[in-house]
Amino acid sequence: KSISFHVDKYYLAVGEKAKLNYSAIVVGEGHLNWSSEKEDIVSVSEGEIEGKSLGTSKVSLSDGTGKKAEVLVIVTDLLEKPVLNDKKKFLPCKAFTEEEALVFDEALETRIKNKGEGSRAALIETIRFLTLSFPYKISYFYENGRLTQNNVRNKADGEGRYYHKGLFLSENKFKDLVATHKGPAIWGCPLTNLEDHGKYKPGSKYPNGLDCSGFVTWALYNAGIDVGDIGAGIDPNVKDMSDIGEMHTLTYDYANSDDYHVGDLIARWGHTALIAGKDDQYLYIAESLLKGVRIEKVSYKNKNSGLYKYYAYINKLDEEYIANDDYLEMW
């Protein structure tokens, strides 16, 4: 028998639960035993771990013959138990140390690897990490340009977009930027804006963050799905998010069907978002708009719902995923 976890480290918030995925080759009959070195810090039951208090504990899976695998589980106060909380404050400038920024990156990376890079579950994990587990809201920022220029954009990297792995929380990441226009500035720090819309005035500085497609492409890329640093759409002459997957018009009947899933795109012209959850009444839409990167709870059962006023289509991403599991779990 051979046992191995998908990760050797995993981060949790106090009160948060997660399922550790593993591979086991069993010869004949055998029973696998779970244990936690410190049950007061991390409890475990049939592969589901729960953060009980701050600290670390090794979680083990053994077969009784001496073969076992271990994961170091770290319960940290940097992460929040994932609940829908629209009262989060916006991320301030330089909120975290370099060491703390690395923890966020490692926490996200190990969650993705635990689910399997390129899978639907990995994308959902990524969406929920930034909108629920991360303790602040990322600000909306109109992009100053992108890596995919399409001859109409400035070439800019990390200005309202971030097509790189991890969170943009440390100035050590400036060295990874391919091009700058008005930056660089990490998320939450002031950056010169070029857009003239509402409170946004050209030449004024606002906290750097993500625009709508900046958030969606960041989430896809971090989950292991490389669609490129592209915009929302719809433009018949340019590759954009509306070209990814299989497009379906968002009607009441379609929204109430079983044809689409959590982890699919939901959008309207010029705006793109991701479905972060679904229950028997509501869709939970993860998006970046003027309120920041957050989850909007909207009814699909009510025919007069804002869902049908503000969104126009759903793009099924079945073909984009390496593993296309139907993700029914909420947070």
Task: For the regions a language model picked out, list residue spans one by one.
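Short beta-strand-to-coil "C-cap" segments at the C-terminal boundary of structured domains/repeats
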Residues: 76-78, 276-278, 312-319
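Short amphipathic beta-strand/extended segments with alternating polar/hydrophobic composition
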Residues: 72-74, 297-301
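Low-complexity, Gly/Ser/Thr/Pro-rich intrinsically disordered linker/tail segments
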Residues: 300-331
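N-terminal capping segments
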Residues: 82-213, 217-223
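Short glycine-aromatic motifs
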Residues: 32, 41-42, 238-255, 305-308, ...
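Extracytoplasmic soluble-region selector
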Residues: 1-82
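...with weaker cross-activation on analogous glycine-rich loops/strands in unrelated enzymes
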Residues: 225-296
